[in-house]
């Protein structure tokens, strides 16, 4: 599992706190201090994974709470999909701002799929975008398993 965090603050991230007890969740932190855009950090992580012959790469925002990270669940999904995410769109119109749900036609378009919970460890609300799992053309970068 690779995520980007400020140097010296990686253990303060929500992701670190919620996965440190999970022996399956090996973490590698790119300490970019918000000086590089996330897509550059993700590309750097992909290059690293290729060089190190990493079997599975999970790219995730550092503010994510993984309540049920499961290698078995990923194994099952990898039988059907090459890349796994929690939300995405079946159609895309590239434009600014480059937000997946806006480029996918917004809510009610029928193009958005998946679900994401927002909130904190005490209170959460679920945003369900549509049917999932579903083959899509663009994924939200909040969680990507390759």
Regions found by a protein language model. Name each.
Residues 43-56:
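Active-site nucleotide-sugar/metal-binding loop of Leloir-type enzymes
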Residues 1-4, 26-29:
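Hydrophobic targeting segments
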Residues 8-23:
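Short, well-formed alpha-helical segments that are part of the catalytic scaffolds
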């Amino acid at each position: 599992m690779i995520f980007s965090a400020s140097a010296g603050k990686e253990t303060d991230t929500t992701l670190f706190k919620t996965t440190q007890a999970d022996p399956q969740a090996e973490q590698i932190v790119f300490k970019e201090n918000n000086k590089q855009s996330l897509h550059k950090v993700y590309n750097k992580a992909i290059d690293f994974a290729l060089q190190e012959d990493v079997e599975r790469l999970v790219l995730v925002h550092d503010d994510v709470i993984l309540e049920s990270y499961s290698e078995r669940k990923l194994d099952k999904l990898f039988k059907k999909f090459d890349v796994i995410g929690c939300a995405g769109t079946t159609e895309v119109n590239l434009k600014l701002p480059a937000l997946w749900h806006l480029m996918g036609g917004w809510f009610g378009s029928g193009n958005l799929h998946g679900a994401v919970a927002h909130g904190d460890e005490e209170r959460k609300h679920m945003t369900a975008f549509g049917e999932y799992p579903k083959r899509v053309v663009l994924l939200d970068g909040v969680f990507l398993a390759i």
